[in-house]
Amino acid sequence: MKKLYLAAIAGNLGMLSVGQFLGWTSPSLAVLMQGKDEGYPIHLTPQEAAWVASLPTLGGIAGAIICAVIINIFGRKNIMLFTVVPSIISWLMIAFATSLTELYISKFTAGLAIGITLTVTPIYLGEISPPHIRGNLTCMSIVAVNIGILVEFVIGPFLSVQNLTFVSLIAPCLFMLIFIWLPESPYYLMSCNAKEETINSLVQLRGKKDVYNEACNIEQFVKASLDDQTDFRELLCVPSNRRTLIIMLCLSIIQKMSGYQAILNYAQIIFDQMNVNLEGKYLTMILGVVQLIFTIICMFITDHSGRRSLLIISCIGTACSTAMVATFFNLQYNHINTKDITWLPVTGIITYIMMYALGLSSQPFTLLSEIFPMNVKALGSMIILITKDFFEFVVITSYLIIADIAGIHVPFWIFTACNFAGALFIFFYVPETKGKTLEQIQKELQRLSKQ
């Protein structure tokens, strides 16, 4: 099993790189909007900053589409290794950009890497993991993302934009050097009729030679899945697939409309508007640490508590937290003295991150890795990633505009409503998948679709 954990850790170095792309925005935008980095030739207006923050989501849509087209041709491992190319190109372009156009292109390229990575990594991890620890290993991806975010939050305020990008180059290079030696997904190998290679992959991943029964189960599952067509009709017309798609689409919208993207990208700016004694950059660091700690907690409890219960608790908790922030800014907007309750929005934001990390951060990702059948997994994942990126783009670009026109409290009230609605949807429609094999999950979805 050592090779399994090594494969999961190495594979998640790509997710750490995703986290660094996401985390770069908060400290860097604060510097570039205020013109504090004299050595960097680009300074941003609020509108330009919104585009820099949101362009990776458009690149992510393109990346998800590309990944869906090529993942079953080149395999999970090769596609994961390919993400190193746009990652390195993007960081180098950011470091040496001399115009706003070049910075825009670099962020779109970063989105390509993010979109491909977020599509292929959960598929790979879901297919190499045994059922009893699949939740832990897929949650590890979100831990890796949050480590990447924390690195940028901690060192970003103290480095120049260019030096920060050079540090960020380490993760994709390290990922390539380690991951190249690890095995391909046994499910993908079996789909290529490479039974001997499948057994070799399982031997490496399980650390034992007696993998014949598992290989036979994989062969039956892959054969049954691939006997069906791989197209939109199969995804939309088969009741269990359609139910799965609707569940994951709604979860994606709930996740992105919960407010996390606004808080992540504009954390330092939001904290600076609270008029608290501690500088925004230090509060942002605290935010990153809290997020990492609670994501690690989630990783260890997800296969005990279950995906569904964590999602419900997370939605209720984030709703209460954003309501606290909205209340403070609502009072401030109406010129009511808030001097004695400056603790309220800080508590709300930190509590939000705690509750988001416990469920909404990782559980949709875990479900994505296990809920689609083989024949429509790439197609379904592509649609989900496109939906996520679209709503992420909407939240990032509209937050500053709505906050400027109507007040900061308005977007936070919207986030509150979406989180409460999300808790209700999850309670009534999302199935529990903990401890089940991929085959058992499909049988359960087929049973639910007949009711």
Positions of PLM-derived features:
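Short helix/loop segments within enzyme catalytic domains
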Residues: 206-207
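Alpha-helical transmembrane bundle of multi-pass membrane proteins
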Residues: 1-197, 201-203, 224-451
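Short, well-structured alpha-helical segments
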Residues: 211-223
